[in-house]
Amino acid sequence: MEPLDTELCYDPDPSIVQPSCNGQTPPGHRTLSPTQQMDHEQQMKISESGQFSDVVENRGLLESSTRLKPHEAQNYRKKALWVSWLSIAITLILAIAAFTVSVMRYSASSFGFALDAVLDVLSSAIVLWRYSNAAAVHSAHREYMACCILGVIFLLSSICIVSKAIHDLSIRVMPEVDGFLFSVSILSGILCSLLAAIKFMLGKVLTSRALITDGFNSLVGGIMGFSILLSAEVYKHNSKVWYLDGSVGILIGLIIMSYGIKLLMDMVPRVRQTRHYEMFE
């Protein structure tokens, strides 16, 4: 009969921590160092976090549902509504002023900014719809629907901006800035940039692509406001660079078009995936 202190030692399974045999580590078993163990645990946590986010999204909810408490989510939702109403009021006034300048001065950048301001009004209205239902603050389907609508609006707006800029370049429209256009450009650049920063922050907290897209549109409006002044100032010092105003309009239009296409490519499949999870509608 074999002694009790002689135990069988099996070949170690790499995925299982093996106990010692007779107080000794089994041969062939490699012990991880503390640093390697920490790296392994960190990788496991990252993997579990990514899988959990996928599960949450597959249930028709945004990632914000796991980050925010109910009262916090409603608080940020109300802030998003207030910012959207403020954005609509400001950009609507700027759009009317920019359209007036565009007609009076034949400015492609002014027309482009006016169209972008109208786009900002529409995108903010979509964000209002997105967060109008208190129970749908974490609804992924509602979020993706809003993004798809924004993508279509971006495409239509970019076509108008590029067409107007090409037309003005073809007839050699010269950029001019008077006191009224200067005031509109400065105000639009500052206000739109501030609105963009606020929307970006709220969009990050609520994990809302629609709010971030609305912020991107406000940022574009601010850039276009400053670009009007830049093109006019360059033309004042060098009349040979008369085409800068129209070129900026084309560039902005192409950027908006690219963003709209990317948005639709990302969101259309997600709308289809979450159409069965309209539990909050």
Swiss-Prot record:
Residues 102-108, 167-179, 231-240 are extracellular. Its main location: membrane. GO terms for cellular component: early endosome membrane; synaptic vesicle membrane. GO terms for molecular function: zinc ion binding. The chain crosses the membrane at residues 81-101, 109-129, 146-166, 180-200, 210-230, 241-261. It is a multi-pass membrane protein. Residues 1-80, 130-145, 201-209, 262-281 are cytoplasmic. Residues 16-44 are annotated as: Disordered. It is found in: Cytoplasmic vesicle, Secretory vesicle, Synaptic vesicle membrane; Early endosome membrane. May bind zinc and other divalent cations and recruit them to vesicular organelles. Belongs to the TMEM163 family. This is Transmembrane protein 163. It comes from Xenopus laevis. The lineage of its organism: Eukaryota, Metazoa, Chordata, Craniata, Vertebrata. The gene is tmem163.
